[in-house]
A protein has these predicted regions:
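N-terminal short beta-loop-beta anion/metal-coordinating cradle
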Residues: 35-75
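Fold-independent oxyanion-binding glycine-rich loops
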Residues: 24-25, 59-61, 82-83, 112
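A short aromatic-anchored loop/beta-hairpin motif
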Residues: 2-44
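Short HxH-centered metal-ligating active-site micro-motif
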Residues: 14, 66-119
Length: 119
């Protein structure tokens, strides 16, 4: 995953961040994932705090693992999950935390096909 999603640098253009999410998804679809930032060293690096570049509101469906489908690692994404990716009181608080405290420049609301929670 490119450095601009790294938690140790300052935010960059939201367009570049979205492009990196798209590239990660393409790697996942093609079966050529990098598994970035998925090491014990990365976990140790994040002890001092997190600075993700993206917050995602997504469904809690176990068939849609967000970090996996975007080929992201520890600290890259701030993921908020609930059934049907709905904006509940709890998810609103998490979004507020991501935007106001973590200063994420990109918020993605993501749904998926065949979601049983929104039938």
């Amino acid at each position: 995953m490119s450095d601009y999603l790294d938690s140790d640098i300052s935010p960059c253009s939201p367009y570049l961040i979205i492009d990196e999410l798209k590239r990660g998804f393409e790697r996942f679809k093609s079966g050529r994932t990098d598994h970035p930032h998925a090491t014990a060293a990365r976990v140790h690096q994040l002890i001092g705090g997190q600075h993700p570049q993206v917050a995602l509101l997504a469904c809690s469906d176990s068939r849609v693992p967000i970090e996996v489908i975007f080929d992201a690692g520890f600290g890259d994404l701030f993921v908020i999950r609930n059934a049907g990716n709905t904006n509940t009181f709890g998810s609103a608080g998490s979004i507020e935390y991501a935007v106001l405290d973590l200063k994420v420049p990109v918020l993605v609301v993501m749904s998926h096909q065949g979601c049983g929670a929104v039938k």
